[in-house]
Amino acid sequence: KSEESNYSRINLQDSEDEIRKKIKKAKTDSSPIPGTIEELKDRPEALNLLSIYSFVISSTIEKTLNTMKGREFSKFKNDLSDALVATICPIGKKIKNLKNDQSYLLKILHEGTEKANSIAEKNLDKVKEIVGFVLH
């Protein structure tokens, strides 16, 4: 099995530079952005990037095509990078902060353990009653 390229995905903890580099290297063709989805049917890489952009900016692919029609992908990739950086980098920073806050993580683990034990105890009591292991 071949090793999956790190450029095949954008990770939540990627830096701004990593995101921009990955988008810049993303495969596209030399044709400009079309105006309709039908024109993208044989251009899966272009459709993928336009779909990602539409999702990140909370738009539809149709609206994105209408706005971007005729633009070169090299310029579009800058807009896509900006949108991804604005969305993903704050998440990555939050993840990093949470990972570095050991007391908070231990508190969450403790609360989760207590909640799980409470639920498990109730379920086990029900099972014992159904099976007949409960002494009255």
Annotate each predicted stretch with a short phrase:
Residues 1-136:
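Conserved nucleotide- and phosphate/pyrophosphate-binding catalytic cores
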